Amino acid sequence: MKQILLSILLASTLMACCNKACCDRNANTQNPIMPIVFVDSEDHTQVIYLTDYLPQVANFDKLVFTTEPGCQVVCVKDGMLTLTCDNRLSVLTAEDTESGKKYDIPVTPKAEYQVGLVTKSYTDSTITIEVLNKYNDLQLLVLWQDTRATACVQYTHPEAVITIEPAWRESKGRSFIRVYAMADGKQLNDLLIPLENGKVVNNVAQLTRHDDQAQVLYSLMIDRFYNGNQANDWKMNSPEVLDIVDYQGGDIAGITEKIKEGFFNELGINTIWISPITQNPWDAWGHYPFANGNKYDSTKTYTKFSGYHGYWPIYTTEVEKRFTTDEELHEMLDVAHKHGLNVILDYVANHMHINSPTLKAHPDWHTDSILPDGRRNFELWDEARLTTWFDVHIPTLDLERPEVCSPMTDSALVWLEKFEFDGFRHDACKHIPLNYWRELGAKMKQRYPNRHIWMIGETYGDPALIGSYVKSGMLNSQFDFNIYHTAIDVFGKPEQSMKRINHTIMESLASYGSHHTMGNISGNHDKCRFISL
């Protein structure tokens, strides 16, 4: 199954690019602006949060907007823009009158998805794209970096030829040509063509850990991975805690040792996702399975739990002493980078432990554990997704309030300020309001404009909900649990049809784009291993 899912990942990585188009040159950037996608095919008006697409811009009052025929800016107010567009591809251009920079943002309508473009061949000066079907009305839009191309694409069915302009050929480092297409009311697959020093990237050996579309993750839970420093071992050894849910000794020093041994390089991965490293409570919490009114059963084993997993933060900016010191963490990150590996940190923003000094000092910073109708607000994942508590000892933070949101986004950035992490895996994203992600994304882009930081989130839900968090100014990616759950059924049950997974993959491509970086996984710490299902 791992090989099949990797093939899916590579297919979405390599499937990229074409349209009729034009471009100016902006500074080289690793993450081109994501397109504005109208979410409703019937409603031609949409309100846009500018920070979702231009988080690097500090003052939106300095922006001047222009559009193409069929697309119109209705109003700009309080960092929001109201846009109307017909069912055609368009471009919203934002010019910063203060810096002189221009940004071209693709605008795509919601439409039926169809695979219609493939890259066919290239030379040093041209790229040829094959259009798979004959269309009556074909629109092609080509951008290099965040600017529309200046020369039109030459299209004679079945081929469209893009001229690689002098500015593209003279660019240093990695840049991208993007192609968007509409045909006869259908949304065609978009294409992404990476360039290195102005030449088409044609070999996987040219891909590095900094290429978002080439991320291959290895997830590990620190306490259960490898013990590299026995001096920091400290079990609870409590009669209330079964040994299996006590600390086992894994630590950051153990990860460093395995990196040096070549364990991760031999696996062929380029990004290590480590579990949370913030300080958790010293004592045991939780008492399975008394939740939800379960009665005591003498035939079952009951236990409290240690915080070995890391998801009960007492402090949001201090390391768990059982796992590491600052010095050991710096060493691990340095060694990882020398071995060509990213390290992303699992970060918990949704909640804190009830004994956190932060909540002791600000007891009103969490949401209410009782709903207005008197019910307990626990594990109501969809009904009360922004306020529900995961458990009685980990209150959900009220991040819709600015006085709570602002310091919590600053706490997340401490890990980038103090350490050379390459990004975050964010826990429980759908339970955190969008204003948190917008503030975090804007602060990150403005404080670290030249640093490559990649963020992937955890959200269970439909593509619309999952995709609402994936914007240039929020998350780069989310795990695609819809593909995961479908794959588990299809690969694990002989009676299931492969058509199901094909449908789910096509739905993801239509929702997130053909070169999205959504995470296709074979499992994680919340899921049983496939072999045990």
Report residues per predicted region:
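C-terminal motif of bacterial Sec signal peptides marking the signal peptidase cleavage site
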Residues: 15-16
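Active-site-proximal helices and loops of the catalytic beta/alpha 8
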Residues: 35, 341, 411-413, 417-521, ...
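Substrate-binding/active-site clefts of carbohydrate-active enzymes
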Residues: 215, 225-419, 439-449, 454, ...
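Low-complexity, Pro/Ser/Thr- and charge-rich linker/hinge segments at domain boundaries
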Residues: 38-40, 108-124, 197-218, 224
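Extended acidic/polar, glycine-enriched regions
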Residues: 155-210
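Short, solvent-exposed loop/linker segments at beta-strand-coil boundaries, enriched for Pro/Gly
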Residues: 64-74, 144-150
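Solvent-exposed, low-complexity, repeat-rich "mucin-like" stalks and linkers
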Residues: 32-62, 117-137
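A short beta-strand micro-motif common to beta-rich folds, especially ectodomain repeats
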Residues: 86-98, 175-181
